[in-house]
């Protein structure tokens, strides 16, 4: 069977997706699978690369290059294709794409149109989980605790910034965290200690989206639970992000590597159980399939607040999701195999509906 590895993308998380894709390829059981590289560059070009029968030595090999004249260029080369050209039988797509145009339902909808099986959440789940404001509303209806928040539309802020500032300061206390509604990997997220910083933070968030979320900042640990499954949902013991920086931002996660992880987290057993229960409930409520990573805040009073549900978590060698499953006894290669089988099963079940 062929795995069509779809990676890269136009989002600011392009480079993260390449690192994740390399880790996935390195764990694939090539005795059973071939891997077809489909690279989406930063301009949105789809590039078909080689069919791999073994893992490349470095992630740089995945940054496919091509020559419009068709000449071979240095390194792995490919040719520009139309997106629909990826369709083929006896294949499953692994969309290792983070952020907008990757895990927000757009690619998932495209693959549904092509009638191809793929790994991960479906269209509705991807779209809702990617939208931080929509996720808040859904989880609030499910009774899952979250930190206080204020959604802010860009046009509202432009028309009457004082009203927005007053609303935020009347509902929340400083520090606040300001996030684009549709973005991941801490891209565009800023901490604000006063009104001036709040204004600058909103401007930063609006670089990425026309909707922003202002959240109450709290002194808390960051706890994460990995989820796996379709109808039968499994969860891991929680892990903890042990920060050496004040804010676990994009650079800390993927560039500076200034974070450490405690797996499993050193937390009371009852808190551990509650985190797993909330993770399963959130996953089920959002209609999850395949995989997700559910992130929580844990206060010194052992209060849990669900932060977000990530339908395509990072798969780099130091990413929390595969490490959490490794702690449960599921090796990286076996995890990839389970995800393939879950994707195939979901496709078969969808095809059986009238």
Residue ranges of model-derived segments:
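ATP-dependent carboxylate activation and anion-phosphoryl transfer catalytic cores
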Residues: 1, 7-9, 268-354
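ATP-binding N-terminal substructure of ATP-dependent carboxylate-amine bond-forming enzymes
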Residues: 1-119, 123-124, 128-130, 134, ...
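Phosphate-binding site of ATP-dependent enzymes
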Residues: 190-277, 298-305
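Short, active-site-adjacent cap segments at secondary-structure transitions
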Residues: 43-48, 184, 221-224, 304
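A short acidic/small-residue loop/turn micro-motif
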Residues: 54, 241-243, 312-313
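Active-site nucleotide/adenylate-binding loops and adjacent lid/helix of ATP-dependent enzymes
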Residues: 1-7, 11-12, 19-22, 26, ...
């Amino acid at each position: 069977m062929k795995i069509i590895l779809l990676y890269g993308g136009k989002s600011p998380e392009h480079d993260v997706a390449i690192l994740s894709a390399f880790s996935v390829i390195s764990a694939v059981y090539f005795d059973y699978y071939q891997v077809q590289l489909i690279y989406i560059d930063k301009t949105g070009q789809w590039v078909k690369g080689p069919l791999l029968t073994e893992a490349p030595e470095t992630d740089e090999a995945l940054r496919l290059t091509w020559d419009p004249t068709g000449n071979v260029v240095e390194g792995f080369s490919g040719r520009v294709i139309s997106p629909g050209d990826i369709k083929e039988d006896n294949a499953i797509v692994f969309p290792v794409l983070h952020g907008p145009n990757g895990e927000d339902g757009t690619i998932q909808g495209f693959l549904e149109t092509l009638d191809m099986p793929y790994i991960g959440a479906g269209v509705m789940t991807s779209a809702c989980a990617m939208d931080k404001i929509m996720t808040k509303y859904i989880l609030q209806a499910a009774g899952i605790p979250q930190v206080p928040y204020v959604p802010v539309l860009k046009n509202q802020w432009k028309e009457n910034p004082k009203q927005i500032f007053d609303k935020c300061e009347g509902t929340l206390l400083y520090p606040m965290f300001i996030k684009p509604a549709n973005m991941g990997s801490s891209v565009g997220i800023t901490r604000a200690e006063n009104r001036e910083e709040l204004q600058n933070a909103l401007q930063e968030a609006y670089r990425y989206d026309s909707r922003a979320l202002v959240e109450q900042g709290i002194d808390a640990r960051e706890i994460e639970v990995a989820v796996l499954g379709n109808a039968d949902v499994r969860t891991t013991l929680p892990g903890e992000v042990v920060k050496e920086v004040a804010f676990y931002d994009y650079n800390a996660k993927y560039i500076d590597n200034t974070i450490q992880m405690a797996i499993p987290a050193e937390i009371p057993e009852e808190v551990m159980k509650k985190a797993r229960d909330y993770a399963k409930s959130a996953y089920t409520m959002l209609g999850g399939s395949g995989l997700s990573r559910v992130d929580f805040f844990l206060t010194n009073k052992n209060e849990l607040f669900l932060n977000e549900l990530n339908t395509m978590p990072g798969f780099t060698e130091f990413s929390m999701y595969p490490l959490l499953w490794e702690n449960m006894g599921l090796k990286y290669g076996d995890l990839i195999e389970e995800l393939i089988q879950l994707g195939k099963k979901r496709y078969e079940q969808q095809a059986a509906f009238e």
